């Protein structure tokens, strides 16, 4: 049994926090994932604590830091870390096999500028990240909760937008991506109303996929089938 924080939101986008204790039905780790957790966690893992992180101490240097929420199996995150050795990267994922997979790929790639949390992202952002310390926050392909009655479960809500804003430096960017058009419209509605942000799109809506976000195999297949992907980037200006 594990205590896992799950977030729901009311009509105003306020957190309705619930802590539930339940068996995580996430499947067993593969042998490779388990080995990576054992061998690489001491090197790249960050144990959650409600104390602010000292990023310079964690990475052994001063550098702009990018944080990704929900990195899945970690392939894209590792690719970004390898392509930008001048940046520090932090990933957050609640799915343990995904954390194990990410650590395995990171070790194979030889990246040294990546650290990961196996924890709830909102708790990490609120308690472990020093305010105004991040250069970019990434939220790629979050659960769309496509049924209308489930929209309150979508992570992109007004209070969440302010949590992200508090973590970003002035000039820092919140980068979102989704393959659900309705969710992209929801994201834009929330972010356009959020104080302290400016849309980086010259047309006031979405942007072209920037070079720093790798094209996933799933996304490439979607393009071939005519499916859309929407990238949204908002800069903290206040």
Swiss-Prot record:
Keywords: Methyltransferase, S-adenosyl-L-methionine, Transferase, tRNA processing. Disulfide bonds: none annotated. GO terms for molecular function: tRNA (guanine(46)-N7)-methyltransferase activity. Its EC number is 2.1.1.33. It comes from the Bacteria. Substrate binds at residues 147, 179, 216-219. Gene3D superfamilies: Vaccinia Virus protein VP39. InterPro entries: SAM-dependent_MTases_sf, tRNA_(Gua-N-7)_MeTrfase_Trmb, tRNA_methyltr_TrmB_bact. Signal peptide: none annotated. Pathway: tRNA modification; N(7)-methylguanine-tRNA biosynthesis. The active site is at residue 143. S-adenosyl-L-methionine binds at residues 68, 93, 120, 143. Pfam families: Methyltransf_4. One of its GO terms (cellular component) is tRNA methyltransferase complex. It catalyses: guanosine(46) in tRNA + S-adenosyl-L-methionine = N(7)-methylguanosine(46) in tRNA + S-adenosyl-L-homocysteine. The keyword tRNA processing applies. HAMAP family: tRNA_methyltr_TrmB (MF_01057). NCBIfam families: tRNA (guanosine(46)-N7)-methyltransferase TrmB. Belongs to the class I-like SAM-binding methyltransferase superfamily. TrmB family. Catalyzes the formation of N(7)-methylguanine at position 46 (m7G46) in tRNA. This is tRNA (guanine-N(7)-)-methyltransferase. It comes from Shewanella woodyi (strain ATCC 51908 / MS32).
């Amino acid at each position: 049994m594990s205590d896992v924080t799950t977030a729901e939101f009311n009509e105003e986008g306020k957190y309705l926090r619930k802590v539930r204790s339940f068996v995580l039905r996430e499947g067993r780790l593969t042998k490779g994932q388990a080995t990576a957790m054992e061998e690489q966690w001491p090197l790249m893992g960050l144990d959650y604590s409600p104390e602010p992180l000292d990023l310079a101490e964690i990475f052994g240097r001063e550098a702009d830091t990018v944080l990704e929420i929900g990195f899945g199996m970690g392939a894209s995150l590792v690719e970004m870390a390898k392509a930008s050795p001048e940046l520090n990267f932090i990933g957050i994922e609640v799915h343990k096999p995904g954390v194990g997979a990410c650590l395995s790929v990171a070790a194979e790639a030889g990246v040294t500028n990546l650290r990961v949390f196996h924890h709830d992202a909102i708790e990490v952002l609120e308690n472990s990240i020093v305010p105004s310390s991040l250069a970019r926050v990434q939220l790629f392909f979050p659960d769309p909760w496509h049924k209308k009655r489930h929209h309150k479960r979508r992570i992109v809500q007004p209070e969440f937008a302010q949590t992200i804003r508090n973590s970003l430096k002035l000039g820092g960017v919140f980068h979102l991506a989704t393959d659900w058009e309705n969710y992209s419209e929801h994201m834009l509605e929330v972010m356009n109303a959020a104080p302290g942000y400016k849309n980086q799109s010259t047309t006031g809506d979405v942007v072209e996929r920037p070079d720093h976000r790798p094209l996933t195999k799933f996304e490439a297949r979607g393009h071939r089938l005519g499916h859309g992907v929407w990238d949204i980037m908002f800069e903290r200006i206040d």
